[in-house]
Amino acid sequence: MGRSLKKGPFIADSLLKKVEKQNTDNDKSVIKTWSRSSTILPVMIGHTIAVHNGKAHIPVFITEQMIGHKLGEFAPTRTYRGHLRDKKGAR
C-alpha cells in the first residue's frame, strides 16, 4: 500500500538540499546517502546518488523511469550465491 496523496512523497531533507544545491551550482558530483526510503523525484534526474546497502555505497544514476520508486530498490542488500550442491555428490 502506498503513501497517502495528501501527505506527499517522503524524501530526506538533507538529500533534497544536496540535490537542489547541485542543481543551482550546475554540479553533477556523486551524492552519498543512507536514506534508502527516500522517493525519487523529478529534480533528481541526471544525478548519481550513492545509496548505502549495509556494507558499501552503490552508485545509482537516476533516469526518468525511476521517478516514484524508492532509492533502496536500486541497491540490493543481499548477495545470491546460488544453491549449494550436495557434499556427497551423485551416487
Swiss-Prot record:
<keyword id="KW-0689">Ribosomal protein</keyword>
<dbReference type="InterPro" id="IPR020934">
    <property type="entry name" value="Ribosomal_uS19_CS"/>
</dbReference>
<comment type="function">
    <text>Protein S19 forms a complex with S13 that binds strongly to the 16S ribosomal RNA.</text>
</comment>
<dbReference type="GO" id="GO:0019843">
    <property type="term" value="F:rRNA binding"/>
</dbReference>
<protein>
    <recommendedName>
        <fullName>Small ribosomal subunit protein uS19</fullName>
    </recommendedName>
</protein>
<keyword id="KW-0687">Ribonucleoprotein</keyword>
<dbReference type="InterPro" id="IPR023575">
    <property type="entry name" value="Ribosomal_uS19_SF"/>
</dbReference>
<dbReference type="GO" id="GO:0000028">
    <property type="term" value="P:ribosomal small subunit assembly"/>
</dbReference>
<keyword id="KW-0694">RNA-binding</keyword>
<dbReference type="GO" id="GO:0003735">
    <property type="term" value="F:structural constituent of ribosome"/>
</dbReference>
<dbReference type="GO" id="GO:0006412">
    <property type="term" value="P:translation"/>
</dbReference>
<comment type="similarity">
    <text>Belongs to the universal ribosomal protein uS19 family.</text>
</comment>
<dbReference type="Pfam" id="PF00203">
    <property type="entry name" value="Ribosomal_S19"/>
</dbReference>
<dbReference type="GO" id="GO:0005737">
    <property type="term" value="C:cytoplasm"/>
</dbReference>
<dbReference type="GO" id="GO:0015935">
    <property type="term" value="C:small ribosomal subunit"/>
</dbReference>
<keyword id="KW-0699">rRNA-binding</keyword>
<dbReference type="InterPro" id="IPR002222">
    <property type="entry name" value="Ribosomal_uS19"/>
</dbReference>
<dbReference type="InterPro" id="IPR005732">
    <property type="entry name" value="Ribosomal_uS19_bac-type"/>
</dbReference>
